[in-house]
Amino acid sequence: EKFGLHGQQLGEVAMGAVIKHSSDWNLGREAALSSGLSPLTPGITLQRACGTSLDTIVHIAGKIATGQIESGIGGGSDTTSDVPIVYGKGLRQRLLRAAAAKTTGQKLAAFKGFKFAELKPDFPGVAEPRTGKAMGQHCEDMAKEWNIARDSQDELAVASHHKLAAAYERGFFDDLVVSFRGVSRDNILRPDSSIEKLATLKPAFDKTSGKGT
């Protein structure tokens, strides 16, 4: 609505999310169809943990730079309010066997030996399956390898909060942020952050020798 794009056909919409439902297997296409853009606008879904939304921008910019498209939209979409919670592997296998069964007897046989413990759901995590580590833990490894001191990390964090607060105050984001359900700015911003306050925080990832909070 803001940019008058209703019904317009763009070169591409690229979207991504760290945690998404299986029904949103092509999130970019679904976002394009729900946005009011022309349904002829193609969509693609990318995923790279916390760098997903930045990668979608790079993807769109690269296509524009090489002349493949004239315009496009890139972004990310994540929420922990409606994450996909699934059944454990044991119950999933039973349900698949029951779905493939031809007779009532075969369907019932799929649940032979069923235990109520199988109803325990599997909650999604953000740790890599390969390493078992989340982004914060990898950051800890990097800080140790590169000898990045705790006070240097705190200084960067404080400067980040102060710069964002100043940008909001001077109106930098006025024409960049669209209010949604009454929210018009990041709700994790702490303008009163200080080195002294951050120094009191305990490590968030490596509880014994970590420096990241």
Regions found by a protein language model. Give the residues of each.
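Active-site-proximal alpha-helical scaffold in enzymes
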Residues: R48-D78, A143-F172
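Phosphate/pyrophosphate-binding loops at sites that engage ATP/ADP/AMP, CoA/4′-phosphopantetheine
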Residues: E1-Q9, M142, W146-N147
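N-terminal extracellular/periplasmic Venus flytrap/periplasmic-binding protein-like
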Residues: K115, S152-T213
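Conserved catalytic cysteine-centered active-site region
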Residues: A14-G72, F114-F116, R130-A134, D192-T213
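Short catalytic helix/loop segments, enriched in acidic residues and glycine
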Residues: E1-K2, A31, L95
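Secretory-pathway/luminal and periplasmic proteins that interact with or process carbohydrate-rich
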Residues: S22, D82-I85, A165-R170
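Beta-strand segments within the central parallel beta-sheet cores of soluble alpha/beta enzyme folds
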Residues: G7-G16, P42-Q47, G72-G76, S152-A159, ...
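Flexible glycine-/small-residue-enriched beta->alpha junction loops
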Residues: E70-D141
